[in-house]
């Protein structure tokens, strides 16, 4: 904004309280403030028709540095003039921090101008020259914030890390902001508390998720072990089932073989029964004629024995005739007389031996013939 439009304390511009309610400051301080403001760089031009481009509920980050360049140009709940005064105040602080090698007179004039600006901003915020539309806040109106609490809450920056030191500086700047614009400081403090609560809820949620993940991992490990045991049992049962199937097939083959053997035996038994029945029908006739061949065989054997004895006697007689031709002639002429004469001892012994031989042969031949007859009758 141009210097002509920048409100200066005691200028009577819009947004400042009337002349009657203004505090009368020393003329030297006013001149010093006017001199410092004239040396400040021009502010960027802003469109007065669109003053609030951002949402009021937009939360600010925790590490926001309020002393950065252009930090006071953001929207606030106060009037436009109050925002411009606060921006001027921050720019004056920046100039004081960067110009440390300036003279003591310039430092005193800068501090005097800053004090005058702060006093004017506080008076404008307290009395309010004109009522404007106030946007609703997302927090309770009864909640208030004290600068002493904010300053006390921020510990010393000695021995802290960069992030903690930045937070402490931010808290200190927020305390200074509470003196100038308490509503904006209240909103920033509420946003910080909400962010802290959200972060805490997020951490709890993450911890709960980690606990659930660990529980699920433990269950997965247990289930994996159980699955391995079940797979091993299943493999054993499958092998046993295969062995039982092989045994069942072997038993079925044995049963089929037994059935075939039984059928063969039944057919053979039936055939033997049929053959036995046929033989039983023709066996009676053969038994009736079984005794006659035996009788004929016995008579024939006796006849053969007699013939053998006669042949032996004839041979013996021929020998006697050759040895004793005279005795043979007498025996031929007188056979009866020859029979009456006693035989020679040698001749008698030979005759007895021949008779014994005939007796031994005759029982054996009769028994064999009798056995042959029995076997023939039983076979028939």
UniProtKB/Swiss-Prot annotation:
CDD domains: bZIP_plant_RF2 (cd14703). Expressed at high levels in levels in leaf sheath, moderate levels in leaf blade, but not in roots. Predominantly expressed in vascular tissues. Disulfide bonds: none annotated. Residues 56-108 are annotated as: Activation of RTBV promoter. One of its GO terms (molecular function) is DNA binding. Transmembrane segments: none annotated. InterPro entries: bZIP (IPR004827), bZIP_RF2 (IPR044759), bZIP_sf (IPR046347). Residues 16-33, 326-355 have a biased composition (Low complexity). Residues 283-357 are annotated as: Interaction with TBP2. Residues 183-204 are annotated as: Basic motif. Keywords: Activator, DNA-binding, Nucleus, Transcription, Transcription regulation. Belongs to the bZIP family. This is Transcription factor RF2a.
